[in-house]
Amino acid sequence: MAANSSVVSVAAAATAVPGVSTVADFSDLQEIKKQLLLIAGLTRERGLLHSSKWSAELAFSLPALPLSELQPPPPLTEEDAQDVDAYTLAKAYFDVKEYDRAAHFLHGCNSKKAYFLYMYSRYLSGEKKKDDETVDSLGPLEKGQVKNEALRELRVELSRKHQARGLDGFGLYLYGVVLRKLDLVKEAIDVFVEATHVLPLHWGAWLELCNLITDKEMLKFLSLPDTWMKEFFLAHIYTELQLIEEALQKYQHLIDVGFSKSSYIVSQIAVAYHNIRDIDKALSIFNELRKQDPYRIENMDTFSNLLYVRSMKSELSYLAHNLCEIDKYRVETCCVIGNYYSLRSQHEKAALYFQRALKLNPRYLGAWTLMGHEYMEMKNTSAAIQAYRHAIEVNKRDYRAWYGLGQTYEILKMPFYCLYYYRRAHQLRPNDSRMLVALGECYEKLNQLVEAKKCYWRAYAVGDVEKKALVKLAKLHEQLTESEQAAQCYIKYIQDIYSCGETVEHLEESTAFRYLAQYYFKCKLWDEASTCAQKCCAFNDTREEGKALLRQILQLRNQGETPTSDTPGTFFLPASLSANNTPTRRVSPLNLSSVTP
């Protein structure tokens, strides 16, 4: 990505941020706290409020510094002193969102701080006008069609300054943001990497870089600075790339070295458990986080997703009311209320709140995906497709949006499109059985039964959360008249259901017992056939067949019909599914490249 020469060349410009240097590890927490307090002030001066808040929260989690260790603010340069009046006035206008006015009074300033605020004010002015035009003239699904008209001018000016080595770490960050907005991804990555070398303490640059990394291979080729901030970046990107085990190891390491009181790290761990669907663990961590930081709004939409999945209506209602009292105009609050109405099956109201969230922040990923789900519930497939596509525009790593598009095209009976989107979802979540089952169903519809069998088998091997894969595989074997394999799958399905203490509410349980009863009957295994037939009598849809089969077995026994001599034990575990030959070993590697729409 960014060449070392370019990093060195830009490093000379970093002198505009005096005193900002980092240590490579966590051996000196006092020094790290000083750095965090310093960068919190520097980002606040430049209007980078989210980065300032992140740094301040992290600093707060570390032990307090003695008076002798507290550092004074960096001294003013000659250029800063000349621009101090214009900067002070412009910053006041900036803080009340009068961006054009701020830029007007900063025009011609020479200090790097004033220059950054001048360019950033112009950028935010363009963003504000774009959002205002979007809200006034178009529905929320059309946001991507309105552009920030200031971007091209900003790119030309920042590029000229960059070539002249006149950008400090903050200027590089803004240049990268402009490039990303213009979809110049490779150039943006190079610039963000430079920004992390020049000013490694600025979390905003790391976060922007994180949003552009699409896979682990891409991450390997980045030339990143050797600093403790890199550990926070890696933990975050691992979570985003669904590499949850690696992410949790990183966060545990950060806790061990001294950040155990960081609400940011605790929330990220909860998000990681949410991503691997360890719902109980994630709920427990979020509840503990709410006790420690009761007015926190960040990540509460993720917490509401967990409450939604568990159908915890009263808890979700309490959370929605609580967040409304704190700040009802936050994006996360709107998403929580949307989830609350969705759980109550009031999908029109839910979609309305997700639209409100998007008016507040058009790039808020969760709202696009959740709105797509609501449109699916309302059978509005065209609107759902638009919403999911916008989610992918915001973040191509969002497997839920790819999966949602697959479901939508499945409803529209367009299997080739459906296959493409399910494959993209599977690439992002290779060990998620839901993606594999969906792929298998798609291959079935395309009559690619070998690929379908691979998918169902793999879904079972990685841990079938919905208990569907074995039944679907069994039915596929039935269709191919592979009776022994079908019986093995049904037996394993029954054993799995009973071993985990499931009730008899599974829809396919009666199907499994009916097939096994008939299979054992054909094999003249009267005891096993009789056991399965008796089980069939417990279900309404198979009761009569079970009784009829029991009568036939009794009649054949009375006639002296003898069972087969090689009778296995009841509900035997076939060798192919035994503990010493697990499904994971038998399943062939999944090749999903055979069909390309």
Curated annotation (Swiss-Prot):
Query: In the record, which positions carry Phosphotyrosine?
Result: 273
User: Where does the record place the modification N-acetylalanine?
Assistant: 2
GO CC aspect terms = anaphase-promoting complex
Listed under GO biological process in this entry are: anaphase-promoting complex-dependent catabolic process; cell division; protein branched polyubiquitination; protein K11-linked ubiquitination; protein K48-linked ubiquitination
Which family does this protein fall into? Belongs to the APC8/CDC23 family.
| Self-association state and partner proteins as the record states | The mammalian APC/C is composed at least of 14 distinct subunits ANAPC1, ANAPC2, CDC27/APC3, ANAPC4, ANAPC5, CDC16/APC6, ANAPC7, CDC23/APC8, ANAPC10, ANAPC11, CDC26/APC12, ANAPC13, ANAPC15 and ANAPC16 that assemble into a complex of at least 19 chains with a combined molecular mass of around 1.2 MDa; APC/C interacts with FZR1 and FBXO5. Interacts with FBXO43; the interaction is direct.
The protein depicted here goes by the name: Cell division cycle protein 23 homolog
Q: Which gene encodes it?
A: Cdc23
